[in-house]
């Protein structure tokens, strides 16, 4: 939805017409449609701010191998579409001229377009297997009038995307704490940064110098927008087990929370010419709701309550926060779900759910593993975010690196025991644990360390670190963070000691292994060999 100024608001959308894909405008007051382009080129596109041009991302199919014998050029060549490339094209809405702007050996990605529509910011990515990180990004500024190119940086590590400031003099850059020679890093001596923990930087185009924006800000940056209306930066981030919006003043670096009405903000959009933010989100016990937020007054207005429709006639149990201090004094955050019609005088079986990897188990109602669904079956459900999780600060996230169960498993075991001690309604002899992917690994690993669980479920779990690292499509990529600098040849004891497969004789708990036979990330062999 865009505005043509003077209060003339309209919606642009595509539809299939007689001559192909049509670009149309829709007047939201009358629903009258006007065809702007009768035969639009196919592909994904974005408007330039002046709405005179469409910038396309066009996929080109790469060279094919024969069907009988395939040469794998590099590990990523096993992934479908690896040899395809995406390039940027420009479509002039007035003249109909459609021209290619980028080409070459690597993909090119649209990052942003300047407010005056003159400059395009785009990037490329190169793979590097001999050092960390395994990808390096280059950023370019293209003058769409003269076609002159300005190389901002080449093959830089730990930087992801960039966007123009409203005046075009600075860039807002997303990356890891190690970006720009580590100016945004905030970890203890001896730690290795967890590059899944997102940071923001300001980059001055005149001086070519960067400065950190979120170095001392604990939440993990997911997305950010530099608003043209008020010049503030709006940040969507993981904040412990919440997903929140914060605003940052680029003039002084001060960050404050936007008082949204939901625990998990799924998506948001800012008006270009008004102090309005729209967002939708959900919480631990409700589905999505859409809101309008007044940036000046700080008030929320409910626009549409989808949750009311989705949860009609559904009874949910209560959800409570429950934290504990680990042996080293760290507060480990968690929460628990009670069955509907809970009776505190009864004894209930309990499920302990965790991921244990680097992403938090957040408070969303709707997720792959719905805690409320398990609670509805008569279980108490306890979930926690142990050391290594993003959203709790860089130091906490860095604990994930070269852990693979170390510290994390101890915290899960300690939390489970303390929870049972403090909650008499749990039947200590009927505790099960479940997790998937890294959580599946954690399920297997836990059974080599404790017998407190009556049953355990590993979904798509990793049983041997070396085979996951070498065979999974993204194994070496994830391991470039999860075990940075550690390989089977320089740390064979670590790869065996932390692998559940090499400790399988210690497992006495009934263990169910669930796996998809087409899994390419954690191949099914991880469960078969276990």
Predicted regions and their residues:
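Single conserved hydrophobic/aromatic residue that forms the stacking wall/gate
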Residues: 1-10
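Non-catalytic accessory segments flanking enzyme active sites
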Residues: 12, 55-58, 64-66, 81-88, ...
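A flexible loop/linker signature enriched in serine peptidases of the S9 family
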Residues: 12-24, 38-43, 57-87, 102-108, ...
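Short loop/turn segments that connect beta-strands within beta-propeller blades
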Residues: 27-31, 92-96, 143-147, 204-208, ...
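Short coil/turn segments that connect the beta-strands within blades of beta-propeller domains
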Residues: 50-52, 116-118, 167-169, 229-231, ...
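Cap/lid segment of the alpha/beta-hydrolase catalytic domain
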Residues: 305-429, 436, 470-474
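Active-site-proximal cap/loop segments of hydrolase catalytic domains
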Residues: 376, 383-530
